Swiss-Prot record:
The lineage of its organism: Bacteria, Pseudomonadati, Pseudomonadota, Gammaproteobacteria, Lysobacterales. It comes from Stenotrophomonas maltophilia (strain K279a). This is GTP 3',8-cyclase. InterPro entries: Aldolase_TIM, Elp3/MiaA/NifB-like_rSAM, MoaA, MoaA_NifB_PqqE_Fe-S-bd_CS, MoaA_twitch, MoCo_biosynth_MoaA/MoaC, rSAM. PANTHER family: GTP 3',8-CYCLASE, MOLYBDOPTERIN COFACTOR SYNTHESIS PROTEIN A. One of its GO terms (molecular function) is 4 iron, 4 sulfur cluster binding.
């Protein structure tokens, strides 16, 4: 099956689908004042999600990542996962979560067809974690990760946003943590959004600083697979785990773009920091609109730019990452 390809030769096997803008954390870099609902939002329903995923699968997509906000706040998440996993052509169903509900809900997600797990974990130190996220929930997350291992989930990744002055001295602790754990930790460079300019100026840390420390500690960059995304992967012979660096301010970051995004309200976003969204929801109400939906997606892909405008301070439509799921 052919894959979606843009005018710059990039293929897109991967969709990030936001299920909600709501979040139960108050992360200092994203929603420091907590989630503020705009009226009564109506996020995509299961039948709309089914039509959406069938369309992207028909266009060659094989991986769906469910994001938020915090997707575990959806009470119908088990049904959503099962619906996505049942679509022919979808081989990988992943979720990105803050992990607080893993002990209670992960078994149900696993039974429904979840194949990969990403957990946001910005610090290994309990007090720091509380400072960054606004919640003292690190023990539940650690319990959930142990459960994920026990269930045999084949892909477990941890996401940590690099924050100068808050967690930038924890790399040695992370290395020790990965010595006996087969996780992949992703260090993500803080990105400027529409509402965090002052915070960005205080806490942005160049990913190069971490890469230099990794190389000095004997870690080696792994060859990039042909279908790899923008992360640079590092490994060490004495560690079971690996480290990925996601550096959106690096020169070649956008060359490795392999994903599209759909918001919780059904807008196609060609770039995390794009200037416009394409409404797909009107074509998600009837099965008979399947061909029109395919045409809208493929036509709009031709408008995808070569790269973002972060270096010029252009953050596009993204007020904060909870609005689109990163």
């Amino acid at each position: 099956m052919s894959q979606l390809t843009d005018g710059f030769g990039r293929s897109f096997p991967y969709l990030r689908l936001s299920l909600t803008e709501a979040c139960n954390f108050r992360c200092s870099y994203c929603l420091p004042d907590g989630y503020q609902a705009d009226g009564r939002p109506r996020f995509l329903q299961v039948d709309e999600i089914a039509r959406l995923v069938r369309a992207f699968a028909a266009l060659g997509m094989s991986k769906i990542r469910l994001t938020g906000g915090e997707p575990s706040l959806r009470k119908d998440l088990d049904e959503i996962i099962a619906t996505v996993a049942a679509v022919p052509g979808i081989r990988k169903v992943a979720i990105t979560t803050n992990g607080t509900l893993l002990p209670r809900r992960l078994p149900g997600w696993h039974r429904a067809g979840l194949t990969a797990l990403n957990v946001s974990m910005d610090s290994l130190q309990r007090e720091r974690f509380k400072t960054i996220t606004g919640h003292d929930r690190l023990p539940e997350i650690e319990q959930g990760l142990a459960l994920a291992q026990a269930l045999g989930l084949p892909a477990i990744k941890l996401n940590a946003v690099l924050l100068r002055g808050l967690n930038d001295d924890e790399l040695p602790q992370w290395m020790d943590y990965l010595r006996g754990r087969p996780f992949s930790v992703r260090f993500i460079e803080l990105m400027r959004t529409g509402d965090n300019e002052a915070y960005f100026q205080r806490h942005h840390l160049r990913a190069d600083v971490v890469i230099e420390q990794l190389l000095a500690a004997g870690w080696h960059e792994r060859p990039r697979a042909a279908d790899a995304g923008p992360a640079r992967e590092f490994g060490h012979p004495d560690h079971r785990g690996s480290i990925g660096i996601i550096a959106p301010y690096s020169r070649d970051f956008c060359k490795g773009c392999n994903r599209l995004r759909v918001t919780a309200k059904g807008d196609l976003r060609l770039c995390l920091f794009g200037e416009f969204g394409v409404p797909l929801r009107p074509l998600l109400q009837r099965d008979e609109d399947h061909d029109a939906l395919l045409a809208r997606i493929t036509t709009q892909l031709g408008l995808k730019a070569a790269g973002h405008g972060l270096h010029q301070g252009q953050t596009g439509l993204t007020p904060h990452l909870a609005s689109i799921g990163g």
